[in-house]
Amino acid sequence: MRGRCPFVLAATLALLLGGRGEALAQQGGAALRDSLAHATDVLAYHPDSIDLRLKKAAWNIQLEQWNYAKDELDKVLFLNQTNIAGLFYRAFVNEKLKRYNFARLDYQNLLVLVPGNFQAQLGLALLNEKDQHLTEAYDGINSLIEQYPDSAVAYAARGGMEKERGMLDLAVYDYGEAMRLDSTCQDYVVNHVDLLITLGRKSEAYDDLRRLQTMGVKSGQLQDFFARLRRKK
């Protein structure tokens, strides 16, 4: 049950892979592995090619081969320590490997090179939340929303933090803003309705469920929400 919500890393991968990443992902792992094998063969003849190493790292990430991706990105940043794509990728990969301090350093170095960069600020805020640097995380996401007040992604990220922390009324507001800014994303509505049901705001929750049905979500996929509403007094 997912709408076409923006996903920063996926968009970056698509750019690096020349628009072929999504199509190959739909074909399955075999196509991805074939592309990775080809990239590896070509790299043998051009070991200092940063572009090829970034593309190979992108395939590794698509296949969730985090250690292989990190090795490639280390080589990219050895060749060019200020490579923006390399820092962004490696921060993501380090986070997947639970190397949180290294990921944080990559994001911070990225922000030195591109101050105010949306992706880096968002990544750093979410990393801080995951690593229990809660004050830094919330300060970071608040700052991001001040800089990018029209970003549905930023509001949804803050809503997710607030939901995890039990700040439910604030989370309802932020997911509502995300829905207002991006009316195509089912995930925002799903989180919003979940919060409304928890808070006992039944009328608004039913409005959200009707909205999801209008967006093409089948009634059967919403049964759990309807059941929770029926149990609410």
Question: Over which residues does each language-model region extend?
Answer:
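Terminal, low-structured helical/coil segments at or just beyond the last alpha-helical repeat
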Residues: 30-34, 198-233
